[in-house]
UniProtKB/Swiss-Prot annotation:
Cofactor remark: Binds 1 zinc ion per subunit.
Binding residues annotated for ATP, in chain numbering: 8-18
Annotated keywords: ATP-binding, Ligase, Metal-binding, Nucleotide-binding, Queuosine biosynthesis, Zinc
GO function terms (MF aspect): ATP binding; ligase activity, forming carbon-nitrogen bonds; zinc ion binding
Name of the molecule in the record: 7-cyano-7-deazaguanine synthase
Enzyme class: ligase
Origin species: Alcanivorax borkumensis (strain ATCC 700651 / DSM 11573 / NCIMB 13689 / SK2)
Cofactors: Zn(2+)
Length: 222
């Protein structure tokens, strides 16, 4: 059976990615990152989603990105904004997806996976530069050059099935695949029980997505 590594944050998008990868016939191995983020409950959500959707393995990789700072998600001295603004927001974590994908690439090579799934999106998103198609295309080129599998003509494919979908379309796709979004945590500052603030940009996008999809929002709010 073909294998895939799925980056799993515990949020709505990455959970949908896992459901899609499974539906496409991949034996899935999930990977989450403890990078010093505010929302610790998202790691619990990632483990929960991985188990319910039948991933063959789940790994949590510890990273010290909080030591770098520069983001409201890793530096508690920077407040999480309640409204989206112009430009790249302070919730952007410098180089996060580059680091995450690099580690997922290493795992994929070790387990001989054919694909890496990541839930980046360029429609209903916060404007992060490492969620754009151009970034994924560049990383794909790098991955082909930088790995034994790529050099030997077996490059791993970076799969981004959500890239051009609206949040409502993502939710509808997940619901069609039987995904329970009550398992997920998307909030930038959820409490230890996964209850969402209802005010941050991630909460706004999630809530609007359920409304537009005509699907009941299962999110628990503080």
């Amino acid at each position: 059976m073909k294998k895939a590594v799925v980056l799993l944050s515990g949020g709505l998008d990455s959970a949908t990615c896992l459901a899609i990868a499974r539906d496409q016939g991949y034996a899935c191995h999930t990977i989450a990152f403890d990078y010093g983020q505010r929302t610790r409950s998202e790691l619990d959500a990632a483990e929960r989603v991985s188990g319910v959707l039948g991933a063959l393995s789940h790994r949590v990789i510890e990273l010290g990105m909080g030591n770098i700072g520069g983001s409201a998600l890793t530096d508690h001295s920077i407040e999480v904004p309640e409204n989206g603004g112009d430009g790249i927001p302070v919730t952007y974590v410098p180089a996060r997806n580059t680091v995450f994908l690099s580690l997922a690439l290493g795992l994929a090579e070790v387990i001989d996976a054919q694909a890496i799934f990541i839930g980046v999106n360029a429609v209903d998103y916060s404007g992060y530069p490492d969620c754009r198609p151009a970034f994924i295309e560049a990383f794909q080129s790098m991955a082909t050059l930088a790995t034994k599998a790529g050099v030997e003509g077996r490059p791993m494919q970076i799969e981004t099935p959500l890239m051009h979908l609206s949040k409502a379309q993502i939710i509808q796709r997940g619901v069609a695949l039987g995904l329970d979004y009550g398992l997920t945590v998307s909030c930038y500052q959820a409490d230890d029980h996964g209850n969402a603030c209802g005010k941050c940009d991630s909460c706004r996008l999630r809530s609007q997505g359920f409304e537009d999809a005509l699907v009941k929002d299962p999110t628990n709010y503080q």
